Amino acid sequence: MAKRAVKDHYENLVELKYQLYNSLFLTLPLDAVEQAGLLLPLLEESSHSGLADGLDPEEILEKFFMSHRPSMTEEARAQFLFKIIQYVERQVVLIDALEDAAYSEIHRTEESNKLRQLVERTESDALQRELKSTLASFGARVILTAHPTQFYPGAVLAIITDLTEAVQSNNIATARELLQQLGNTPFYQKENPSPLDEASQLIWYLDNVCYEAIGDISDYLEKYLDTDNLDSESLLSIGFWPGGDRDGNPFVTAAITKEVSAKLRARIIEWYLRDIKVIRRRLSFPEISEKIEEIEQLFHKELTNQIPACFSSPKELISILNKVQSSLEDNYQGLFVDKLVSFKRKIQSFGFHFASLDIRQDSRVIASTLDEILETHPPLLSSSFENLKEAEKIAELFSIQGSLQIELLSSPSSLDTVSYTHLTLPTNR
């Protein structure tokens, strides 16, 4: 789509609606609005003119207060500026909601669907085989990063979601109530978010974006390429930083890594439980319904801590579903088999981990840990290890025989490095 067309749509669907909803915001009985909302346009004008005249921020504010609130004390000025920040924060949230509500129309996602265009073009040019071959070696990895300043509190995220829906349906009354809720909801957090808090915030995006989107993309490709052999996990995967990025967050420990991975596993099983309940409503046939109910019960038992794991691996679950699929095709005219196959694709994509934790650590910490291990466990590596080439060092590290006595290590960073390495070994193997 031409840039001009996008700009026009943005002006009509976001900027004009912003004027409407911001006007609603100004009518609400909110402290920040009453103290700051009406003066904000004047402060904006003073800032523009002051910068144009070469004034610094302190001079701009002094001139503004002398012109519009000359009797304000220093404390009152500080309080006023704080209210300005509160008000602007909520204006930004309003814009976020308006942009989300208008995104598909602004960008004409149905018309500019690049994936659909690609598939249709390969069909018209008889290049389906080439596309299949390309996809067999293609992979895209979405990385969900984390930083405390990136996140709205959970309550604000929920308001954005509901406000987006109200805007899309032109429900002015509900939007006004949500704006009032927004004005009374704090944006600050009493404590800095922990790595577990960051993980919980990002799981919101896994739930509300990634799960359905990746499932839809996999279904679309396999339907239009007429194949069920795509490697969904390799084609689209998700990396997850919270709980693993030790080089970026000193509060990440092996215990946090384990807790985040358990949280991710529980969340994806909750999704599978929801989906299998929907499937069970359709697969009401003899024997098949019993098998689907067994799967549902196993999911439920793991989530309620009645059993340690519902299945030994995703492959075990897929093997059971393959048998159900064969029975559907052989005995029940393949009825609703598409729903079962779509569910299998999600299992192939997300496994029981949902997103893979990106375990990262400063190389200096790893080197220091290795040095301490060699000092306390000299027989583990050859005496010439330091003189080996990099490839030879790697080969020797992977061929180590023997066990590590963790109680001999004294450095906290070494203890944590060994602990999280031990956690990841079953996955790597």
Language-model segment annotations:
Residues 1-395, 409-416:
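Often metal-dependent polyanion-binding catalytic scaffolds in large enzymes
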Residues 403-407:
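Active-site-proximal beta-alpha loop/turn segments in soluble metabolic enzymes
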Residues 251, 427-428:
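A ubiquitous, low-specificity "background" feature that marks scattered single residues
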Residues 421-427:
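Conserved small/polar residues in nucleotide/adenosyl-binding loops
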